[in-house]
Amino acid sequence: EDIRWPVGGEIDILENRGRISNISSSALHFGKQWNKKSTLVGEALIPREVRFQDKFHSISLVWKENYIAFYLDNSLDPYFTINSDHPEFQKYKYPFNRDYYMILNVAVGGKYDDYWVDFDAFCSDRACSNKENPDSHRFIIDWIEYERL
């Protein structure tokens, strides 16, 4: 099936900004072409006293016909839900009722976050390098589980 982006839609299960450690987000992208599209974002707010990066977390995606929900860890309440009745799907067709491929894009940085660059966050000394201790600064995916309901 030759469906181009963003017509076919994109589901981002997890997106984070390194400089904002108390927000984890998920996003849906869809539309007619790259400059005529919508992006819907849901954010899970983590209390500031909790260091989100100090332990593994589970991001769950419940994906049913005309409905998508995202959950953080063991919460019974989703932090982001969308269904095909959302007003943005009046402008652009709801594309999420079809099969998808899973792609793990584990990029860090880039032009996400409104092109904002925190130059103070660049690693320029041994204190922020992980050369001597690779475990100190990594993005680790422990496991992925797929279950068809």
Q: Where in the sequence are the language-model features?
A:
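GH16 jelly-roll
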Residues: 1-149
